[in-house]
A protein has these predicted regions:
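Structured alpha/beta or helical-core interaction and ligand-binding surfaces enriched in interleaved
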Residues: 2-89
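Short, compact, well-ordered microdomains
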Residues: 81-115
């Protein structure tokens, strides 16, 4: 039973970059900046999930959507790992902090596509 409980201190470590929405002044204009999950993928039960996650993350960065995020993110995107209770593996999400206008463009162009 003890192994099934979530280790909240470890989860906090993975989510340390997450912040709420904020407003910034960029080129004399006030823009809203917030976090957005830009890519998700699953991984089976492997010995070192961080090591095995490097390839899918790198492959996504080479896509058109990945290049857009890397160019328009306000700071370096980060990944978050969670346990996947459905298949005893892991779920990874890549999160980026972007302007609201860039988030809208990304959602309209890339969400729901294979890119």
């Amino acid at each position: 039973m003890a192994k099934l409980l979530r280790d909240l201190s470890r989860e906090k470590e993975y989510n340390q970059h997450a912040r709420g929405p904020e407003h910034m002044t960029i080129n004399g204009q006030v823009v809203k900046v917030s976090d957005m999950v830009v890519h998700r993928f699953r991984m089976g039960d492997v010995e070192d999930p961080v090591l095995y996650a490097a390839q899918p993350i790198h492959a996504w960065q080479q896509t058109e959507a990945g290049r857009f995020v890397m160019e328009h993110a306000m700071e370096s995107p980060w990944w978050v790992r969670h346990m996947d209770p459905m298949d005893y593996g892991y779920q990874f999400a890549i999160v980026a902090r972007m302007k609201e206008s860039d988030q809208t463009f990304y959602s309209l162009k890339y969400v729901g596509t294979t890119n």
